[in-house]
């Protein structure tokens, strides 16, 4: 009930202002008696994934809490893990405003944020300050002004800095809002990046005395052949996991709606079927050798179960969480418990 009232207010606001209002509210109320308005008691439903035991199979997808400012608030809602970022080596403002648009009739969102974040050093300070003990995935990317050919260096810088604070590291090469980024999903550039990250992981595991798994986040706008090549590269380079999928450039199911023609990646309910189909194909190509986090368009517990049935081991939510509220977390966990 409280969330529906809050949503009604926030949906009257500009989407990005509403986003900042929500984050500021969480920062102000986390670890205080006021967190009773959104905190949920959820019985553990542990999942083993990439060698890490997660308290439940539902995570917060990257992009909601880019700078890790609200970890304790989101943890109180019951998320089994929180993926912060995408973070880059240096702070950057992202793309020009406006850059975030609701497609309310379709329960969709279009964004062209452009990896706006306060930089990896600021993120680390926030990770150190968090009190909840939440499992944190750190989603890393490259700065906009770093040439694609040198993008690998940005990923290695971020990986080096976040390694000791992360439960896992997500490598984002699939945002449509950073020029040239998606080219890293193909051929020699992909193999070179994954091989370099795997070598860095080995060095950091020795340095810190712990193994932090790495996962690759992929786009939904891929051909069957491209999915196969990505799977082959993941297996060849012994990556620990895959995250499928990011936002789509497709406008299927939203044409004619207000804001549908805005440039950027489409998320939310219109992405659901496309994302699930990519998960199914990727799972087949990986043949059980590498586990998958399913994300993209989950708007109900049934949507989450579809992703698990397609081959995912865990799920993440973001746009569906905005439209449905914290109850969606609990609904999915309960459905997963029944599915077992």
Swiss-Prot record:
Q: How does it sit in the membrane?
A: Peripheral membrane protein
Q: In which pathway does it act?
A: Pyrimidine metabolism; UMP biosynthesis via de novo pathway; orotate from (S)-dihydroorotate (quinone route): step 1/1
Q: Which residues bind FMN?
A: 62-66, 86, 139, 172, 217, 245, 268, 297, 318-319
Q: Which domain of life is it from?
A: Bacteria
Q: What is its main location?
A: membrane
Task: Give cofactor(s), names only.
Answer: FMN
Q: Which reaction does it catalyse?
A: (S)-dihydroorotate + a quinone = orotate + a quinol
Give the enzyme's main class according to its UniProt record, as a single word: oxidoreductase
| EC number(s) stated in the UniProt entry for this protein | 1.3.5.2
Whichever gene encodes this chain, its name is: pyrD
State the free-text cofactor note.
Binds 1 FMN per subunit.
Please state where this protein is localized. Answer: Cell membrane
> What is the designated name of this protein?
Dihydroorotate dehydrogenase (quinone)
Q: Report the family membership.
A: Belongs to the dihydroorotate dehydrogenase family. Type 2 subfamily.
Give any Pfam family that matches: DHO_dh
Q: What is the lineage of its organism?
A: Bacteria, Pseudomonadati, Pseudomonadota, Gammaproteobacteria, Alteromonadales
Cite the binding residues for substrate. Answer: 66, 111-115, 172, 177, 246-247
């Amino acid at each position: 009930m409280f969330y529906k009232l809050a949503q009604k207010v926030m949906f009257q606001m500009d989407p990005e202002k509403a986003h900042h209002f929500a984050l500021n509210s969480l920062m102000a109320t986390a670890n205080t008696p006021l967190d009773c308005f959104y905190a949920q008691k959820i019985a553990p439903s542990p999942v083993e994934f990439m060698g890490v035991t997660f308290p439940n199979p539902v995570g917060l997808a990257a992009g909601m809490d880019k700078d890790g400012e609200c970890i304790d608030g989101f943890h109180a809602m019951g998320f089994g893990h929180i993926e912060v970022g995408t973070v880059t080596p240096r702070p950057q403002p992202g793309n020009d405003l406006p850059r975030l648009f609701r497609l309310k009739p379709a329960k969709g969102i279009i964004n062209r944020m452009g990896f706006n974040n306060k930089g990896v050093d600021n993120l680390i300070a926030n990770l150190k300050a968090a009190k909840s003990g939440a499992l944190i995935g750190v989603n890393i990317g490259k700065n906009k002004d770093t040439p694609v050919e040198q993008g690998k260096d940005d990923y290695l810088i971020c990986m080096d800095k976040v390694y000791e604070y992360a439960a896992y590291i997500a490598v984002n090469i699939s945002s449509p809002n950073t020029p040239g980024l998606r080219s890293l999903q193909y051929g020699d550039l992909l193999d070179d990046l994954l091989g370099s990250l795997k070598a860095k992981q080995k060095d950091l595991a020795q340095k810190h005395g712990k193994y932090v798994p790495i996962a690759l986040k992929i786009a939904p706008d891929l051909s069957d052949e491209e999915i196969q090549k990505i799977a082959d590269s993941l297996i060849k380079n012994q990556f620990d996991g895959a995250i499928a999928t990011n936002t789509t450039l497709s406008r299927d199911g939203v044409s004619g709606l207000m804001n549908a023609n805005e440039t950027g990646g489409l998320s939310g309910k219109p992405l659901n079927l496309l994302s699930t189909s990519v998960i199914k194909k990727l799972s087949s190509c990986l043949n059980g050798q590498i586990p998958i986090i399913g994300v993209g368009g989950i708007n109900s517990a049934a949507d989450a179960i579809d992703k698990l049935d397609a081959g995912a081991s865990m799920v993440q939510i973001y746009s569906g969480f905005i439209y449905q509220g914290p109850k969606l977390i609990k609904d999915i966990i309960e459905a997963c418990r029944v599915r077992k």
